[in-house]
Swiss-Prot record:
Protein known as: Peptide transporter imqJ
Highest taxon above the source species: Eukaryota
Lineage summary: Eukaryota, Fungi, Dikarya, Ascomycota, Pezizomycotina
Keyword Manganese set for record: no
Domain Fe2OG dioxygenase: 348-468
Gene assigned in the entry: imqJ
Length: 510
C-alpha cells in the first residue's frame, strides 16, 4: 500500500513542478530546488534506516517523511529535465556537414533531438541497473549502507548541476501550459467543445478588451496533444502489468530458490529489455523506416491518426466536388439557362485541394501596406470553396464603394462555415454577367484596430479550386453574347488561359 501511494504521489507532483517552472521560477531553478528537496529525502531515508533510529521507534515516520520529500523532488525533476534538454539544442532546422570521409550529409534538427533523447533514455536505463549493486549491498551490509550510496551519488550529480547552472539555456517563465490548457478547454466547453473559439484571434474579434496568454498556434498544439492522448487508453492495462515488477514479482521471487541472487533483482528486467531494444530501434529499425518513407519523429507518430489522413482528404475532395456541381446547377437555374448547360462545361473536372499555412509574422509591415499574406487576385477555375480557421484576414472587393481596389473583411460567423468565391472561368463563360471575386489576405480586422498586437498569429485554410479540364473552352458562351453585349474575352482553352495569366503575373512578353 505504501509503495502504491508513493508511486501515485510521484505522478501527481510533476503537474505542480510544471506549473512552478513555467509560470514562476523557470526550469533550472525548479530543478535545483527540487533536487535539494530530493537530497533531503535521501538523507532522511538514510538516517531513518540507522539502528539508532530503529531503537527510537522513528524509522517508519522517517521513511514516510523521506518518501514525501522524494516525491516532491521527483515532481520538479521529472517534468523539467526533458524539456531543459530539448532547449539546449539551438541548431538550425537543417544544416550541411562534411564528414571526415569527405561525404556531405544533412543534419536534421528533428532527428538530432530524437538521437539526443534516445541517448538520454539509454543512460536512464543504464542507471536503472543500480539496484543490482544496491540490493547486494543491502543484503551484505544493511539498508543504511545501501541508502547512503544513493545519497552520495545524487549529491555528486546535484553539485554538478549547481555549479554549471549558468551554462544552461532556459526559457524565462511566462505562463503555465497547464493553466492555459484548462482555460482553453473551458472556453471550448462553453462553445459545444469547439476549440476554435479559444483562439486569441477569435476572442479579439468578439471582445477587443479580452487578452489571452497564448497564441493561435497553442490551440493547434493542444489539438495535436489531444490526438496523441489516444494511446493513454491502453495505459491502465500497461501499468497494471508494469507495477507487478515492484510488488508481486519481488514477493514471488522471495518464495523461490534464488541461489544467492537477491529477489529485488526482478525490477531490472525492464531496463535490460530497454537496453537491448533501444540500439536496435535507433540504429536499425528507425533508419530503415525513414528510408521507406515512414519517418518516426514526433509525438503524434505514436497515434494512428496519420494513416487516416489520405482517406480523409480523398473523401473531402469528393464532397467538395459534388457541392460545386450543385452550386453550378443552382447558378444555371438563377440565370434561366437550360439544365446542364454550365455543368457540362465543368466536365471533365480538373479540381484541386490545397492546405495553406501562413506562418506568424510581424504586424508593422501590414500596417504600412508593405506586406500582405496574399495580394489582391482572382482565382483560376470556376468557383472556389474556402474553409478557414478563426484567425481571419480574408477581404473581398467592395464593389459598392465606387472606387477600385476597395476591400471589406469577411467576418466569421461559424467555425464550420464554407465561403464560396466566383472565379475566372465562370466570369469568362458568362461574359462578365458573373464577375470573378477579387480578394486578398491581410492582417485580421481586429489586429488592425489594436495597437497592442505586435505579431499576427499563424493562419490555416483549406481551399478547393473547382476547375474545368485543361482542354475545355473558357470563352464566352453563346447565350451571353448579344449585339448589345459583345464577347469580352477571346476564346481559348483553360490551359491556354492559365498560361496567359501566368505570363501576365510574371511580366513575361508573348
Amino acid at each position: 500500500m505504501v509503495n502504491q501511494a508513493f508511486m501515485l504521489w510521484c505522478y501527481i507532483t510533476p503537474v505542480l513542478g510544471a506549473v512552478v517552472a513555467e509560470q514562476y521560477i523557470g526550469r533550472v531553478k525548479t530543478i535545483i530546488f527540487s533536487s535539494s528537496v530530493y537530497l533531503c529525502g535521501l538523507v532522511t531515508l538514510f538516517l531513518s534506516s540507522l539502528p539508532t533510529a530503529y531503537a527510537m521507534g522513528i524509522s517508519l515516520p522517517g521513511l514516510l517523511v523521506s518518501l514525501f520529500l522524494i516525491g516532491i523532488g521527483t515532481g520538479g525533476i521529472k517534468t523539467n529535465v526533458s524539456s531543459l534538454i530539448a532547449e539546449q539544442y539551438t541548431g538550425p532546422k537543417e544544416s550541411r556537414r562534411i564528414l571526415k570521409s569527405g561525404e556531405e550529409v544533412i543534419v536534421d534538427r528533428d532527428l538530432t533531438i530524437q538521437r539526443i533523447f534516445t541517448t538520454f533514455f539509454l543512460y536512464i536505463n543504464i542507471g536503472s541497473f543500480s539496484p543490482l549493486l544496491i540490493t547486494i549491498i543491502e543484503k551484505e551490509y544493511g539498508f543504511s549502507a545501501a541508502f547512503s550510496l544513493s545519497a552520495i551519488t545524487f549529491s555528486i550529480g546535484f553539485i554538478i548541476v549547481l555549479v554549471s547552472r549558468h551554462l544552461y539555456i532556459s526559457r524565462d517563465p511566462d505562463s503555465s501550459i497547464i493553466f492555459n490548457a484548462c482555460k482553453a478547454f473551458w472556453i471550448a466547453i462553453k462553445h459545444k467543445g469547439n476549440l476554435d473559439y479559444a483562439r486569441p484571434s477569435y476572442q479579439t474579434e468578439q471582445a477587443a478588451t479580452r487578452r489571452l496568454s497564448w497564441d493561435d498556434s497553442f490551440i493547434d498544439d493542444l489539438r495535436r496533444a489531444i490526438a496523441s492522448c489516444k494511446i493513454f487508453i491502453l495505459y491502465p492495462i500497461y501499468w497494471a502489468a508494469y507495477s507487478q515488477f515492484l510488488t508481486n514479482f519481488i514477493s514471488q521471487a522471495a518464495t523461490m530458490e534464488t541461489h544467492g541472487v537477491p529477489n529485488d533483482i526482478m525490477t531490472n528486467i525492464d531496463p535490460i529489455t530497454v537496453l537491448i531494444l533501444l540500439p536496435v530501434l535507433d540504429r536499425i529499425v528507425f533508419p530503415f523506416l525513414r528510408r521507406q518513407g515512414v519517418p518516426v519523429r514526433h509525438v503524434d507518430r505514436i497515434t494512428i491518426g496519420m494513416p487516416d489522413f489520405q482517406p480523409f482528404v480523398q473523401e473531402s475532395y469528393q464532397i467538395c466536388q459534388r457541392t460545386c456541381f450543385q452550386i453550378i446547377s443552382a447558378i444555371e437555374l438563377g440565370l434561366g439557362l437550360q439544365a446542364g448547360r454550365l455543368t457540362q462545361c465543368c466536365q471533365p473536372a480538373a479540381s484541386e485541394i490545397r492546405l495553406l499555412y501562413y506562418p506568424p509574422t510581424t504586424k508593422n509591415l501590414f500596417d504600412e501596406g508593405l506586406k500582405k499574406r496574399a495580394w489582391p487576385h482572382t482565382d483560376l477555375g470556376i468557383i472556389t470553396l474556402l474553409f478557414q480557421d478563426m484567425v481571419g484576414g480574408l477581404e473581398v472587393e467592395d464593389r459598392a464603394a465606387g472606387k477600385p481596389r476597395s476591400f471589406i473583411p469577411v467576418k466569421r460567423v461559424s467555425p464550420n462555415e464554407m465561403i464560396v468565391n466566383t472565379s475566372d472561368s465562370l466570369q469568362r463563360w458568362t461574359n462578365n454577367v458573373i464577375r470573378a471575386g477579387l480578394h486578398q489576405v491581410t492582417a485580421p480586422d481586429a489586429a488592425k484596430l489594436s495597437n497592442g498586437v505586435d505579431m499576427l498569429p499563424a493562419r490555416c485554410s483549406s481551399v478547393f479550386f473547382f476547375k474545368a479540364g485543361r482542354d475545355t473552352s473558357v470563352g464566352p458562351l453563346p447565350e451571353f453574347v448579344t449585339e448589345d453585349r459583345p464577347a469580352a474575352f477571346e476564346d481559348m482553352t483553360a490551359l491556354q488561359y492559365q498560361q496567359l495569366k501566368t505570363r501576365i503575373l510574371h511580366g513575361v512578353e508573348g
